[in-house]
Amino acid sequence: METLGSLKNVTAAEIYNTVSGTPWNGGRADSSNILDVASANGVFFQYVAADDCHFYNGDACRSYIMVQAEELSQKAILEAIQAGRFYASQGPRIHQITVENDTVTVECSPVSCAVFNSHLVWSDDRCKTGDGMTKIVYPRSDYGDGERFVRVHLTDAQGNQAWSNIIHF
């Protein structure tokens, strides 16, 4: 944690990298656990998913970011990334995330699982499951001192995932 906390001027951290997963590299593709611990300790990053292709069979073009830029130009894309207007994905689309009255609403492409991760070790109704969910509503937990933030993790029926950036309350 000391090392992560000492990092400055970091645009984003890689939450998922396909080539680090099995069968190529021993199942270390997902770094969400360590990033969640960092967030719980007040060290916040924006999240990207990426594939630095090594030309293994099946490692290319599986993880990426979706950017909400004003136009399709390098300048606009970089501005959107710096402003945090992006999310990491392997397929599921996050159309909109809104926070109103301590309730998070996610509108997305059809998913079968939505998890609202936070600094709390437990939160009632954190995991939502169902077939083809396109709107998921999550009330902020008041367990303990209440949630300070959440991160949305979506999984579709094919096992593809999407990760939002941190949503602060």
Show which residues each predicted segment covers:
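Charged catalytic cores and adjacent phosphate/nucleic-acid-binding surfaces used
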Residues: 2-169
